[in-house]
Amino acid sequence: MDYLLKTEPSTYSFADLQRDKATVWDGVSNPVARRNLRAMKPGERLVIYHTGDEKSAVGTATVVSVDASDAKNPQVKIKVGEANARPVTLAEVKANQLFAESPLVRQGRLSVVPLNEAQFKFLTGE
């Protein structure tokens, strides 16, 4: 499965991930989002999504490892992938039937969202 990770760019942006090459994704408080983090497996693909004023998918990453030993604070190590050729905006997502039932649209505050293959391709411009 693929996932989308939301981040406020003023806190940690895709540019920060590009600089760092890898990071640990943790500190997620929503129980559904934590469950999605715990379900991740090494090698799975991620879309990095900027919240706030940008509201757009900006790049990709890959799951390196998952430490779910603390159910209330699962930690996922991710490594940077590629920047999108252009950001894919929330308006584009909402206009696409691929996302009609997606938590990305239906649960706007969810910070870790499962994606299917077609959604991943749309969000990355593939």
Residue ranges with predicted function:
Residues 42-47, 112:
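Hydrophobic/aromatic beta-strand segments within beta-rich folds
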Residues 49-55:
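Short, charged beta-turn/beta-strand-edge "cap" motif at the junction between a beta-strand
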Residues 1-42:
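Compositionally biased, charged N-terminal/linker segments
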Residues 56-67:
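Short beta-strand-centered aromatic/proline hotspots
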Residues 47-48, 62:
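Hydrophobic beta-strand signal
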Residues 1-11, 29, 68-126:
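Contiguous surface segments at macromolecular interaction interfaces
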Residues 15-19, 62-64, 91-96:
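Surface-exposed flexible segments
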Residues 1, 21, 42-44, 57-59, ...:
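A generic structural signal for short beta-strands and their flanking turns/coil linkers
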